[in-house]
């Protein structure tokens, strides 16, 4: 995996602005891993994809994952800060697309981005979950008669086999003390960083081009430290 330059980040933000969140994740990985095909990345198990997104975040933006969510009980802000490198290293074992999970006498492969994209076509969560399950089923039996508890049980079995497929953290509300589990959507997390960095870069290009008459390529070729120093001098 290669790191992404300032020009890469601007290009990503521009190309991915109107894409579905799943496609944004694959676009970012394609930029960082040009040797991998887009189709191949779409068929990676979700944990493998999220691990790569974590590695990319650490490479470009550093290991700190900071955010917040509102308490469902009282609305108080619950902040969190994680070390992405520690999280990635804790799940450094290989996840194979061929891995099979057995549940209720049936076998299932691990879900991929392509499976989630198919599920996203459906109007409600349960129908989407059933569509993903059917795509992942490797046997001949159907799961049409499964109830919500069966789907939840399979979801737990798949999560145990691929822990990074759904990244969840435990939080405690500082206001009411309510404990909850929240999901970190790694693609959305990474894309928010890409968008913030891109907008800052656009401002720096605009400011320095006006002040010094430099071309965009010249400005982006500067190191971040030098570019920030020039931008600060322009504002002074």
Region locations from a protein language model:
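Long C-terminal interaction/binding lobes of large macromolecular proteins
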Residues: 1-236
């Amino acid at each position: 995996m290669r790191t992404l330059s300032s020009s890469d980040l601007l290009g990503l933000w521009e190309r991915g602005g109107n894409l579905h969140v799943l496609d944004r994740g694959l676009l970012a990985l394609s930029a960082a891993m040009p040797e991998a095909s887009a189709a191949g990345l779409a068929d990676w198990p979700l944990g493998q994809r999220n691990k790569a997104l974590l590695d990319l975040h650490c490479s470009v933006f550093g290991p700190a994952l900071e955010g917040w969510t509102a308490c469902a009980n009282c609305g108080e802000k619950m902040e969190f800060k994680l070390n992405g490198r520690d999280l990635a290293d804790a799940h450094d074992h290989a996840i194979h697309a061929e891995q099979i999970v057995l549940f209720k006498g049936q076998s299932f492969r691990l879900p991929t981005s392509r499976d989630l994209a198919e599920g996203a076509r459906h109007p409600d969560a349960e129908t989407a979950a059933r569509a993903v399950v059917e795509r992942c089923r490797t046997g001949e039996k159907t799961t049409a008669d499964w109830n919500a508890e069966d789907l939840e049980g399979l979801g737990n079995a798949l999560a145990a086999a691929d822990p990074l497929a759904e990244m969840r953290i435990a939080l405690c509300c500082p206001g009411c003390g309510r404990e909850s589990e929240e999901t970190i959507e790694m693609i959305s997390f990474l894309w928010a960083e890409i968008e913030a960095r891109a907008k800052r870069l656009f401002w720096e290009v605009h400011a320095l081009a006006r002040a010094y008459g430099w071309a965009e390529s010249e400005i982006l070729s500067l190191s971040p430290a030098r570019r920030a120093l020039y931008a600060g001098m322009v504002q002074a």
